[in-house]
Amino acid sequence: MTDAFQKLFQQMLQSGQEMARAFNPALEHFDMRAMEKLVPTIPADMLEMWFGKTFNREGLDAKTRLLLTIGAITVQGALAEPQLRMTVRQALAAGATKREIAETIFQMSMFGGLPAMQKALEIAQSVYAEEDEE
């Protein structure tokens, strides 16, 4: 990252934090990682309701929607690590295999680049390791 880009990025973060404070002062200290610890996985029934066939009877099932979400987050690079960790965990709970998750991430290398793919794979592997420990 160039210094100019880094400075711009920091200004954007600061601006976002100021906006959050203006809308809701309680959001000033919101930490997505704390949210991840609070709700490690969403119950399967809720997953199916939100991402599955409840609202989209003829649409995609929860597993497919979550794999698409993993792809979208991967393309963003390392900007949404807690969200990717939660989505990988949710996809596993919805029946996705580690191989399907990895293939989804590999496919995104064409759109997000190799560094984004590598970071997403590292995050997915850390989720797998946590799941294996439990």
From Swiss-Prot:
Keyword Membrane part of the UniProt annotation: yes
Q: Keywords in UniProt for this one? A: Cell membrane, Membrane
**Membrane disposition:** Peripheral membrane protein
**Which residues, if any, are the signal sequence?**
none
Single Gene Ontology MF annotation: peroxiredoxin activity
**What are the record's GO terms for cellular component?**
plasma membrane
Localization (cell): Cell membrane
* Listed Gene3D superfamilies: AhpD-like (1.20.1290.10)
Q: What is its main location?
A: membrane
Q: What does this protein do?
A: May have a role in the regulation of NDH-1 biosynthesis.
Q: What is this protein called?
A: Uncharacterized 15.0 kDa protein in nqo9-nqo10 intergenic region
Organism of derivation: Paracoccus denitrificans
